């Protein structure tokens, strides 16, 4: 076991604080409409430029191990805020820095660290409750556009694109961000249910000019099994041929004789048919087949339910207005499923999302939810260079997370005003002793930090502006972009309540732990001289051997 370096008390806290300040100072220059960029060097390729707090935080690793521990703990604040709300990482880092700095001053002055932490926690609990009271719903496209614009660094085009995407696919719809091929940002909307499985044979293609299969008003056969024997399919093929409608087969796999027969029937025009593999794997495949069956009002032919393919009838088949298949994807448009059944399935998936523990499971459940809800929107980001593309894509993703958070929990006045107003409202709370009261005051002072930093980054005097804002009421605040005072809601400067709440909660949690730290332990650095001495010994022996041979 490696020898350890141990530091206690003030010596440990000073080192830790230095690390906190290095990371936070690098992150906070990005805050606000006039925040600056940070250039990040990469071990390969061109440097990247970002205005995203968590991206800056993730790159910072300090040489001094004790300082690095402080930096890593604040990095955790940014990461947690990012995971919870997808935005607000710079605000969270700034709040943590403010609480740690003020808190450690109080500890140095002789206050009890545990009581300080209790006071901070008490203030934060009250502040979160006040934020919820202050919050207003974010229901209309205008508010969504404003939230997206602010989070995308005052890029109105991005804000309106996100609002447009939410209008088209719904609040629960899947909206993804991709790198575009041109200079302009674009929105592409895929209506209906789309999954990542293409046609099993190119011979099914009936639109050769575009290389796709298009089926109008088709029947849809869903089977949770491999199909290789054509005899299993003959009864249903004959019934579909008599109806004159096309047929889409979705199964675990379809191969050999069965696939060959379908191709021949399709090419001869006996029955217009296409086949694709079912999406997903294992239990997820079963669930997605069930989703498709509810959307199209059909049944999944499953041997687990003692159902046989040979005995299936037209009543077991789903139906849709249109199906489009290319080599990679299948899109089912206008399924005839009953709205009540679809809504019940959506509610069931929402419940599963709440109970899911892994991010991967939540992501896959959200995809299923969106496909049932109405569609998928793709935001294609345009830029002139790859460096600009990466920076812009990160901003658009932040804006998308912020708008989702706003829809979920509502919005509060932006620009740091919400926390200033909350601090004023809870200024009369008291702790059980004087040390707790100091902790409460530490938290209240820290809540002014985001406003002060926004003002500082815009080149104005933080104390003057902060006092002017504190003298006002309600939504009155400072618009750093235009250097004027007024109603922040009217200015369109809004923050999602969830983002502000998460930033405050995570910052106070980690900062409280740092304030109560009394000892820090890390590995001692290896003695480079001894390493050099050890490595030179074999080399010298080898040389001696060579001399003897000569």
Swiss-Prot record:
Location of the protein in the cell: Cytoplasm
Region (Disordered): 526-550
A single Gene Ontology CC term: cytoplasm
GO molecular function terms attached to this record: ATP binding; ATP-dependent protein folding chaperone; isomerase activity; unfolded protein binding
Keywords assigned: ATP-binding, Chaperone, Cytoplasm, Isomerase, Nucleotide-binding
Class of this enzyme: isomerase
InterPro entries, per database record: Chaperonin_Cpn60_CS, Cpn60/GroEL, Cpn60/GroEL/TCP-1, GroEL-like_apical_dom_sf, GROEL-like_equatorial_sf, TCP-1-like_intermed_sf
EC code: 5.6.1.7
SUPFAM superfamilies assigned to the protein according to its UniProt record, in alphabetical order: GroEL apical domain-like, GroEL equatorial domain-like, GroEL-intermediate domain like
Any single GO BP term: protein refolding
Biased composition (Gly residues): 541-550
Catalytic reactions of this protein: ATP + H2O + a folded polypeptide = ADP + phosphate + an unfolded polypeptide
Family according to the record: Belongs to the chaperonin (HSP60) family.
Function: Together with its co-chaperonin GroES, plays an essential role in assisting protein folding. The GroEL-GroES system forms a nano-cage that allows encapsulation of the non-native substrate proteins and provides a physical environment optimized to promote and accelerate protein folding.
Record-linked PANTHER family: 60 KDA HEAT SHOCK PROTEIN, MITOCHONDRIAL
Subunit annotation: Forms a cylinder of 14 subunits composed of two heptameric rings stacked back-to-back. Interacts with the co-chaperonin GroES.
Name assigned to this protein: Chaperonin GroEL
Organism of derivation: Buchnera aphidicola subsp. Baizongia pistaciae (strain Bp)
Gene that specifies this protein: groEL
């Amino acid at each position: 076991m490696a020898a350890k370096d141990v530091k206690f008390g003030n010596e440990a806290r000073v080192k830790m604080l230095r690390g906190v300040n290095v990371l936070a100072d690098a992150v906070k220059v990005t805050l606000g409409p006039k925040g600056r960029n940070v250039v990040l060097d990469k071990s390969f390729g061109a440097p990247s430029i970002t205005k995203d707090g968590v991206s800056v935080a993730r790159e910072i690793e300090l040489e001094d191990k004790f300082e690095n521990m402080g930096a890593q703990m604040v990095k955790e604040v940014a990461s947690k805020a990012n995971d919870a709300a997808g935005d607000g990482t710079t605000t969270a880092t700034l709040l943590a820095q403010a609480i740690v700095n003020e808190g450690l001053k109080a500890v140095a002055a002789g206050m009890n660290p545990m009581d300080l932490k209790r006071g901070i926690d008490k203030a934060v609990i009250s502040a979160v409750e006040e934020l919820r009271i202050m919050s207003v719903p974010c229901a209309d496209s205008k508010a969504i556009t404003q939230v997206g614009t602010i989070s995308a660094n005052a890029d109105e085009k991005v804000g309106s694109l996100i609002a447009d995407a939410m209008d088209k696919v719904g609040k629960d719809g899947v909206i993804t961000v991709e790198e575009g091929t041109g200079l302009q940002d674009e929105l592409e909307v895929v209506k209906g249910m789309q999954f990542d499985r293409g046609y099993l044979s190119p011979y099914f293609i009936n639109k050769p000019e575009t290389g796709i299969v298009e089926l109008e008003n088709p029947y849809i056969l869903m089977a949770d099994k491999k199909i290789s024997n054509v005899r299993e399919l003959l009864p249903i093929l004959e019934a579909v041929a008599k109806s004159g409608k096309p047929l889409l087969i979705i199964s675990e796999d379809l191969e050999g004789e069965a696939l060959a027969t379908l191709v021949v029937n399709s090419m001869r025009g006996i029955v217009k048919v296409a086949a694709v593999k079912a999406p997903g794997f294992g239990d997820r495949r079963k669930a997605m087949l069930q989703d498709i069956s509810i959307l199209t009002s059909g049944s999944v032919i499953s041997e687990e339910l003692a159902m046989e393919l040979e005995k299936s009838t037209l009543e077991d088949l789903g139906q849709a207005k249109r199906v489009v298949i290319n080599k990679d994807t299948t899109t089912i448009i206008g399924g005839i499923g009953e709205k009540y059944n679809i809504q019940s399935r959506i509610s069931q998936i929402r419940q599963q999302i709440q109970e899911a523990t892994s991010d991967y499971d939540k992501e896959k459940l959200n995809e299923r939810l969106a496909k049932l809800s109405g569609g998928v929107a793709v935001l294609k980001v345009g830029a002139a260079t790859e460096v600009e593309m990466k920076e812009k894509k990160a901003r658009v993703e932040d804006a998308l997370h912020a708008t989702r958070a706003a829809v979920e929990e509502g919005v509060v006045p932006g620009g740091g005003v919400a926390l200033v107003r909350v601090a004023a409202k809870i200024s009369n709370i008291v702790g059980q002793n004087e040390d707790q009261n100091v902790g409460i005051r530490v938290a209240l002072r820290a809540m002014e930090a985001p406003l002060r930093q926004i003002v500082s980054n815009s080149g104005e005097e933080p104390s003057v502006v902060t006092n002017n804002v504190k003298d006002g009421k309600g939504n009155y605040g400072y618009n750093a972009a235009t250097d004027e005072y007024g109603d922040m809601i009217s200015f369109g400067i809004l923050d999602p309540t969830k983002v502000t709440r998460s930033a405050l909660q995570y910052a106070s949690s980690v900062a409280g732990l740092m304030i109560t730290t009394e000892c820090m332990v890390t590995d001692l650095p290896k003695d480079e001289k001894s390493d050099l001495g050890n490595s030179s010994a074999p080399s010298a022996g080898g040389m001696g051997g060579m001399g003897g041979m000569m």
